[in-house]
Amino acid sequence: MAFLPRYYPENIEYLKISKENTPLKEWYIPMTCFCDIPLHQMSYHAEGKAQTGYGKFSIALHKKFGINNGIQPVQYLNSNSIPTEELRNAISILLSDNGQIYSDEALISLSNHLFEYMRRIKPLDGSMKKWDKEGKKYVEIKKNFHDEHEWRYIPDFESDELPFLLYRQDDIIAESSSQFYTKSITETKNGLLNFSVSDIRYIFVDSILSREKLISFIKRKQKGKRIPRAEKDILISKILVYDEIKEDW
């Protein structure tokens, strides 16, 4: 079993950066995101207000799974702070570089560090794109990101495989219209985030009917990597109905 990362749009207007005199409003990062939240706060994130909730289906994993796989908490930024201003200046230098940075080994190391940091930042609050209820298009919603305690898995692509980040308009159009880059992640060497039954703590579903359907699916599963019957039983024992247990929180 594995999580498949996808190129996800991040609103970066708060950084106020430009490329070739054109303001950058968003970039796409290949990632799988997790929230490090206590169970008693889960209803706020699952249901939220209007379209801000993420839904009642989720998988809870042991934290050691994330730590062992190099999953990193994001850094939340106050857009008015001095560190954010200095970061803005550094990113502008990196984006406007004409090749000089990559002629010096020390500067290469510094630029690589900055680049990885760029992929793991988020404002304290702001807007984000989220699939609508029908799963047909993105809608933009307002969120307090700091409440999510987000951790990110970002695949370690080889330099000749896929882009580490999309910011050019033609690349963004290709991804947003057809998931051009996301569909290629399965072909990369280290793109998938593998996990096992033992890594799972709970599986939440919205209703008893959904639990019955999921149990039936697990029992019938034949395609792909086979799961031994004993592990199927363990997996089934981890399934919880959200609406049944939320009152206990």
UniProtKB/Swiss-Prot annotation:
Keywords: Plasmid. It comes from Lactococcus lactis subsp. cremoris. This is Abortive phage resistance protein AbiGi. Transmembrane segments: none annotated. Confers resistance to phages by a mechanism of abortive infection. Seems to act by interfering with phage RNA synthesis. Does not act at the level of phage DNA synthesis.
